């Protein structure tokens, strides 16, 4: 991806170059020889040093990528492609799909992409982006509440929510970004087909009356809203994230079934608009995949914002009457609301893939570490494999699938340090293991924490709530997990992901300098607290 100068550790003259510019070179491969002037390098001298270096690395427990034993599809002679044939046919234009299509084209492939609806997938059209436009509104409303205390005297504290303008603005944002995705595809000469693609075992894809063929197929059909089978669930007053974002009239009350990321984010939006919101979650806390301490802190903050949160309880029946709903809970209680939001998660979207007879795991397409399915040459990155239902994870899986489709299975998808965030106020983010999981796996761990209550930037911004929590291995100080609740958590967590991906220890991280005044100083303080060295924290008890 870059050109850089490398300083030779030995002096001498360049005797021989064994690899040329533009070649892909495996780790430990010899690329040239330095020696005394006039010295001769034998033609077969490239293999021994490389083999010795490889053996040393493998003995140390490190994985060394191997050059493919057979010529890759990108380098061997190929028959010419017919007009309706492609190196890669991508089915689905969401994050995994469009990313894979563009990456395949960058690698010199002839690529087609099939999309039945709008490009950008759930994230862009009905998920990440639309919810962030609404959550920004909630943030602005929070700002109005503290304006007077900061010396900003508003002529009136009264405001109204114009849902028509809210929805129209959201739609304009979505339109801008979906158009951008199509622009990138066209710029990379990816052929676009609109319609539902029916994929066949012979790697043909039928779109309406047209059939195209791929040497490789990438299935990126994404996911859909998960539903529950209880009486009354089909009421028109029960919405999902697919339709609540187009609601142009605010209900007086909203019952949210599911306290995961989507339910909590949308619940907060409507609570900030003045709607009476009740969240019902079957687990013992909201967003149960998050670190328990962080989850409980968020629950406490949201309760103070007016959201009613009920945990360890489920909905057994919904009764509609008098333009409202009665949700009957399995503990005998009832909730009455004008509308309900079903947000219990998502499941893979398999429409158009019925003919393939792929191996599935609980309804998810089973893939190997190369993103390849049970059928060689057919890959399935993103939500459809259920590994990590996050857009940024889908980007990586799509990228890996495209590279493997073009070059043979040469790259694995490493997703252990994929960050995740909840865009509430305050934000929540995590990367790596929770404290509970780390203790179960490693036994003795160290915990470092630093509160935003002592962070100068947070205090000045009226955002002095929450904390950063670091989980580290007690022996080597390896960073096992980072968890944040507080301002800019979704931005700060990317520092943690980079640190962990590059295997920096706490001791090594503390060699860095963080700017002041910044929210990210709290990251440094939490890392220092792992070792009991945080200057702005009270001394740890011995």
Residues covered by each model-derived region:
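Small cofactor-carrier domains centered on a conserved lysine used for covalent cofactor attachment
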Residues: 1-44
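Intrinsically disordered, low-complexity linker and terminal tail regions
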Residues: 36-85
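Glycine-rich flavin
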Residues: 71-77, 84-85, 102-109, 114-250, ...
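Beta1/beta-strand and adjacent pyrophosphate-binding region of the FAD-binding site
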Residues: 79-96, 250-262
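N-terminal Rossmann-like FAD-binding beta1-loop-alpha1 element of flavoenzymes
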Residues: 87-113, 262-272
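Short hydrophobic core segments
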Residues: 89-91, 197-198, 212-222, 256-257, ...
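Flexible, glycine-rich terminal cap/loop adjacent to redox cofactors
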Residues: 91-93, 105-117, 129, 133-140, ...
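FAD-site-proximal beta/loop scaffold in flavoenzymes
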Residues: 231-251, 334-407
């Amino acid at each position: 991806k870059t050109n850089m100068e490398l300083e030779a550790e030995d002096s001498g003259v360049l005797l021989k170059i064994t690899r040329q510019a533009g070649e892909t070179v495996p780790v430990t491969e010899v690329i040239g020889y330095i020696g005394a002037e006039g010295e001769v390098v034998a033609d077969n001298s490239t293999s021994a040093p490389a083999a010795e270096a490889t053996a040393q690395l493998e003995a140390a427990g490190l994985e060394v990528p191997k050059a493919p034993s057979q010529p890759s599809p990108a380098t061997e002679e190929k028959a010419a492609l017919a007009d309706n044939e492609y190196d890669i046919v991508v089915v689905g234009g969401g994050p995994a799909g469009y990313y894979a299509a563009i990456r395949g084209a960058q690698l010199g492939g002839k690529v087609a992409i099939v999309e039945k609806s709008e490009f950008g997938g759930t994230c862009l059209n009905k998920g990440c982006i639309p919810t962030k436009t609404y959550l920004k509104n909630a943030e602005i409303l929070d700002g109005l509440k503290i304006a007077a205390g900061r010396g900003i005297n508003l002529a009136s504290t009264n405001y109204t929510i114009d849902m028509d303008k809210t929805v129209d603005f959201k739609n304009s944002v979505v339109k801008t970004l979906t158009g951008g995705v199509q622009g990138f595809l066209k710029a990379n000469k990816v052929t676009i087909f609109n319609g539902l693609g029916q994929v066949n075992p012979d790697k043909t894809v039928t779109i309406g009356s047209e059939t195209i063929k791929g040497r490789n197929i990438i299935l990126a059909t994404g996911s859909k809203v998960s539903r529950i089978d209880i009486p009354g669930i089909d009421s028109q007053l029960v919405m999902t994230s697919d339709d609540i974002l187009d609601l142009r009239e605010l209900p007086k009350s909203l019952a949210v079934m599911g306290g995961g990321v989507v339910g909590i984010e949308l619940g907060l939006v409507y609570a900030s608009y003045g709607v009476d919101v009740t969240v019902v979650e079957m687990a013992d806390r909201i967003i149960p995949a998050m670190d328990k301490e962080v989850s409980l802190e968020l629950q406490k903050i949201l309760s103070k914002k007016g959201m009613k949160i009920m945990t360890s309880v489920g909905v057994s029946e919904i009764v509609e009457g008098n333009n409202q709903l009665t949700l009957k809970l399995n503990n005998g209680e009832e909730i009455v609301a004008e509308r309900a939001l079903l947000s219990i998660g998502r499941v893979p979207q398999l429409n158009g893939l019925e003919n393939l007879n792929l191996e599935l795991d609980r309804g998810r397409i089973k893939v190997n570490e190369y993103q390849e399915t049970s059928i060689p040459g057919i890959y399935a990155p993103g939500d459809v494999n259920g590994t990590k239902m996050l857009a940024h994870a889908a980007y990586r899986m799509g990228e890996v699938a495209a590279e493997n489709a073009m070059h043979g299975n040469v790259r694995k998808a490493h997703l252990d340090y994929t960050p995740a965030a909840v865009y509430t106020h305050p934000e929540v983010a995590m990367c790596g293991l929770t404290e509970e999981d780390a203790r179960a796996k490693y036994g003795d761990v160290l915990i470092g924490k630093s509160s935003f209550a002592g962070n100068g930037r947070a205090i000045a911004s009226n955002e002095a709530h929450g904390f950063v929590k670091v989980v580290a291995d007690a022996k080597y100080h390896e960073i096992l997990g980072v968890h944040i609740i507080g301002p800019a958590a979704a931005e700060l967590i990317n520092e943690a992901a980079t640190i962990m991906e590059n295997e920096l220890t706490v001791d090594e991280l503390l060699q860095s300098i963080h700017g002041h005044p910044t929210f990210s100083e709290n990251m440094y303080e939490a890392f220092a607290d792992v070792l009991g060295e945080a200057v702005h924290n009270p001394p740890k008890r011995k």
